[in-house]
A protein has these predicted regions:
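Short catalytic-loop micro-motif centered on adjacent basic/acidic residues
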Residues: 50-53, 77-81, 145
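Conserved small/polar residues in nucleotide/adenosyl-binding loops
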Residues: 169-175
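Histidine-centered active-site/metal-ligand motif
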Residues: 83, 88, 141, 152, ...
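Conserved beta-strand hairpin/beta-sheet module of binuclear metal-dependent hydrolase folds
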Residues: 7-67, 71, 158-161, 165-168
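Active-site metal-binding motif and surrounding structural segment of the metallo-beta-lactamase
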Residues: 58-105
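Metallo-beta-lactamase
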Residues: 2-12, 106-156
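Conformational gate/switch positions in structured elements
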Residues: 14, 54, 84-86, 173
Length: 179
């Protein structure tokens, strides 16, 4: 499976670990997606490693395997949560079971939702609450968090990596072509 991660490199340090859902026919239960959609997630490999978002519960094992292969034995420092809708956040608890020393990065609304969705998840000492425009240095990669409330849900934020000029936008991407 390591070979798959190698093929999914965005840059030398950014690896796509998302999953594809070819069976879904409606995005958000209303928009036709005849060829399915992708749940986006990435690993940023730097002095401190970050994982961007989780995926739908149905794809948890595949996603965790993708993450494991991208990490190649390393341990993530951060899991960055940009959106708490269940098809993006369902695997937070599973991720923390596999990587219990990881810190979760999110805004205050994110953590309110996490405590409501995952009542048994103990994040004592593992929360990094960010404010709008706050930066997080991973090493050479510097991430800036930009809040976008009600673009979709109230806690939504996007993350900009100024090193590689990459925006992580959290949402699944419906497509008219095969992903």
């Amino acid at each position: 499976m390591k070979e798959r991660a190698e093929k999914m490199k965005v840059t030398d340090e950014i690896i796509y670990v998302g999953v594809n859902d070819h069976d879904i026919d409606l995005f958000e239960g209303q928009y036709i997606v005849p060829n399915g959609m992708a749940y986006n997630s990435y690993v940023i490999r730097d002095e401190k490693i970050a994982v961007m978002d989780t995926v739908d519960e149905a794809f948890g094992e595949e996603w965790l395997e993708n993450v494991k292969n991208a990490l190649d034995g390393a341990k993530p420092e951060y899991l960055i949560i940009q959106h708490m809708e269940p098809d993006h956040s369902a695997n937070i608890e599973k991720f923390m079971e596999v990587y219990p020393d990881t810190k979760i990065v999110g805004n205050a609304k994110t953590f309110t939702m996490i405590s409501n969705f995952f009542r048994n998840l103990d994040l004592e000492g593992k929360k990094v609450v960010v404010k709008n425009q706050e930066k997080l240095e991973l090493g050479k990669h510097i991430l800036t968090f930009v809040f976008a409330p009600m673009v979709h849900w109230p806690e939504v934020m996007v993350t900009y990596d100024s090193t590689d000029t990459v925006s992580y936008t959290h949402l699944t991407l419906p497509t008219n072509s095969r992903v």
